[in-house]
Amino acid sequence: MKIKSSSSHFAIPNPRGPMERKKRSITQLISQEAITNKILLLRGKKAMLDRDLAKLYGVTTGNLNKAVKRNIERFPEDFMFQLTKDEEESLRFQFGSLKRGQHTKYLPCVFTEQGVAMLSSVLRSKRAIQVNIAIMRVFVRLKEIISTHKELAYKLNELE
């Protein structure tokens, strides 16, 4: 078994073949922390901006939104909604995101966890599948963390 090397890193051949290597590299590029940092609390729901999802999926925001509009019946209001002008301004102020002049004239769309799951039926590339799996794992992890905190708070209340 040969080990290929370059000046910056070593690559060990994958016994499962080149496709498996490709899948793993996409998942590795998208860290859980990077996804977690893109999840916002909007209208009381954990959600992600269309532009952040588009970057993760490797498509333009316009193409992502076009695919959604072609399948709009799959995205009810609790799966996807458009930010109001006030919400956009609030995000710009709070996070320095959505900087003026860098985005289109349209207000951003936001996808809840269910909306992100539904995107997998609209965006069908191999990358989209891997990205969706990674995002779903992060949402599950966040639920587990929240559940653990609730349990700890309950136990603390019992001790008092």
How would you describe each model-predicted region?
Residues 1-160:
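Basic, low-complexity intrinsically disordered segments
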